[in-house]
Amino acid sequence: MMNNKKSIVLFYIVTALFWYSLYAYVPIFPTYVESKGISYSMVGIILGSYGFAQMILRIPIGILSDKFNRRKLYVTLGMLAAVSSNIGLWYFDEASLILLFRAFAGVAASMWVVYAVLFSSYFKQADAPKAMGFLLSVTTLGQVSATFTGGIVSGSFSDKHTFLLAAAAGIIGFFLSLMIKKEQKDITKEPVRLKDLLSVGKDRMLMLVSGLAILSQFLTFATTYGFTPVAASKLGASSYELGLLVTISALPGVISGALSGSFFGKRFGERNVITVGFMMTAASVLLIPFINSLTILFLTQIAGGFSKGMVFPLLMGMGIKNIPNDKRATAMGFYQAIYGLGMFLGPVVVGILTDAVSLGTGFVITAAIGFLAAVTAFLSLEKAKSACLDAA
């Protein structure tokens, strides 16, 4: 039996491989699907299926894992779903099957909530938040290393090889997941019930920040994980440059995310930081149709990545701040399921607009949604905060 320290290190490795297997092909995936002669509307639906699967499965998977207390099983199933997705994407070229196996990646990502609960069971309650911080850092490391190396592999071999790279990581992760430690027997968790979800859903602040999170994810999955790589390829970006583009879009968010609550929020106020973050993101998207240089596109995406990183952690924190401790896990499940709608709608809407009008129009409308989110945040967050304080 492994000691606890080795168990934790093993879990970190499994987590990194899990996200690596889901992200290795992401930079080239939009252009890969486009190269199959598939319409932009269908490209958007394929890209959005990842978020759609998470939107409908996250809460049921959380409920089932709580009910049967078999969380290690769901970690292993998540790896299998990721491997199945990657192999299917490598083997099949038909649009319907690409859609199916991309949705399988969303099924795999839906298991993430179980990863977090299982990992937290390795620690005393007081140490769990710090441990989760490390786990989220490992998650980011897995994603960023995947997008960077995926671009290199695609440029050196072919787009198809990125699916094999992702599958290899998933297979290694699957076998390692068989060795991770089960949850502590003395730790129990009350299963989430539908009435609990409906109860926390009535919280005004949680509903507001969940709506803003939908818009935040809309922006991210319409652009960075959606059609920005398509715009870059039209400017002559190589596969390596597409990988680099997605990587440098994510890295600044790691820095701004770490500073969002500890520095920016305290110094300038949460509402102001969220408002400015949405405005900066919208501006970076609005510029895309008018850019004729890859260098300028890279710079705008660095700025956009930094601004997105400021927004999301603050929204998450504000959503559960006034929720009672015994309902915070339920509130987080509600929040995560809700923002999956933005992951789905972002690429779908831009794909439809691109077919109907142009890719540039898709970016302009996406930017408009970002500015709308900024106005909504500025006008509504303080009112909702005051209402919560009055009700307390």
Positions of PLM-derived features:
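Cytoplasmic helix-loop-helix junction between adjacent transmembrane helices
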Residues: 101-138, 318
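C-terminal membrane-cytosol helix-exit motif in multi-pass small-molecule transporters
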Residues: 167-186, 373-381
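Helix-breaking motifs and short loop linkers at transmembrane-helix boundaries and internal kinks
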Residues: 69, 91-93, 290-292
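Interfacial helix-cap and linker-helix signal at transmembrane-aqueous boundaries
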Residues: 33-34, 64-65, 152-157, 232, ...
